[in-house]
Every structure is written in C-alpha cells, then in structure tokens.
Amino acid sequence: MLSHIVEYECQYTDQLYKKRKIWHDGRLKYFQLNNRFMLYTEKDNVLLASEFKINSKELKAILNPEGFDIEEHRIFSQFLVIISNIIEEYDRDIQVAATHVRAYPSNLSVQKQRPLISDNAPSLNHISTAREVHSNIKVTTPNRKQTEDNATKGGFNISKLTLKVNKPFKKPKRILSTNVVNESNRPSIRSQKIQEVTPQLHETNTSTKVQTAGKVALNNDNIAQGNYATITEEAKVRDGSDRKKDMANLSKSGKRRVGGIRRIVHEPLGI
C-alpha cells in the first residue's frame, strides 16, 4: 500500500530523569498510513525504536511546527525526542501485515509432523485383529539373566513389575515361654486400664478391713478396762488381816517380796 512518509531532523536522549541530559543527533520517520514513528541514528542509520500512536491529540502535539526545537516529546518508552525541522517528504509502497493474524502452517508441514503408520498395522475398527497381533508378541529374557536373578534373590523369580519393597513371606517367630517379657507382645491400652483399677480396689478393701479391726480392738479394750476396774475394787475391799497373814508366810519362807503381783481373770460380760 502507498503511504506518505515524512522525515524529521531531531535530537534524542535516553536519560529520562536527569536534569542535565546528553543529547544525540538523529532522524525521525513518520508514516501517515498507520501513524507509526521510527527513530534512527544519524551516522549509522541504525533503528533505535518504533512506536504506533493512536491518540489524535498526541499526534497533533508532536507534529505541530510551533513546538519544534522547544518541546520534548516522549514518543518512545526509552527515549525523549526534540523535533528540529523537516528533512524531506515522499511516498512509498508499504506491506502492512495485521499483527493479530497468525500464520498457520501449510498442509505439507502438518503431514510431516504426523507419525508414519504402516499398512500392515491393524486399524481401530478391527479390534479383534489388533488383539491377536499384540497377543503374539512375547517378551523373553535370556537364560543367563534368569539364573543370575534366582541366585541373587534367594531363589525367587521376581519380575520388574513388582515393587522393591516387597519381600518373600517369613513365618512369625514363636514365643517359647510365657514368662519372658517381649516388647512386641505388650498389653493393649484396655488391659493396662484393668490392671490399674484392680490395685485401687484392693487398697479400698484393705482400708475397710483395718477400720473394722480397729473398732473391734477398741471394744475389747473397753471390756478389759471394765473387768480390771471391778477386780481392783474387790481387792481394795480386802481386810487388813489377810494382808498380814500373807506377809508372815513370806517372812517364814525366807522369800523376798518383789511387788504385789495379782492374777487378773477376764470373765465375759453378759451384754
């Protein structure tokens, strides 16, 4: 398509945020067909940046000749531009390609990407023939490899599909004596609770027995004290003549009296 192109003499810089900037000479091209700006270096004619401007207000401000050599325009994201004057204007044919249209591959490239299928292979419609073909194919291993596997793995022919964690079956060990404490045969939580409850019951039973025995012993002591009191009262009632006779008998026999020893007889009370 034919487009009108205008070339401008300009100065550009990439120091966007500095107060004292260094400016370089360049050329700016403007395409009226698609409102495109292109920035080139003056010496080497190297393309530095290109940008499309859609906003009409921005276009008028950039192309206004009153702002030449005065205003700084940020046409590109990385450069500031000051337009000086117009160099030349001309028309040229330009191939405009839409950016949103994707170039799809041709049929030849699609055919190359597809896998090559042999004529002898069965199709999907003939399922029975496909099964027959796959059933005829067998995977065989050499005899040397089988013997090595049997020797290394304890006589068990383990295929590649089995997991490495799996091992041959081993019988459980038998416990010979019941008295041997084995950590693997520890009681469960329920049996532990029962064992904890039984000693508590035993303690409560023994405490009740001790309390009843103490009460019985106190009753017996009270009875004994009552009998002793009655006997001592009877002894006090004795006459002085009996005591004198006892003393005389002891002096004749030559025995020395150590103390008054009395025999206390406990008799049951009729309660």
From Swiss-Prot:
Molecular-function GO terms, alphabetical: enzyme activator activity
One GO-annotated biological process of the protein: negative regulation of telomere maintenance
Protein name per the record: Uncharacterized protein YGR042W
Organism: Saccharomyces cerevisiae (strain ATCC 204508 / S288c)
Cellular component GO terms held in the UniProt record: chromosome, telomeric region; cytoplasm; nucleus; site of double-strand break
Top-level taxonomic group: Eukaryota
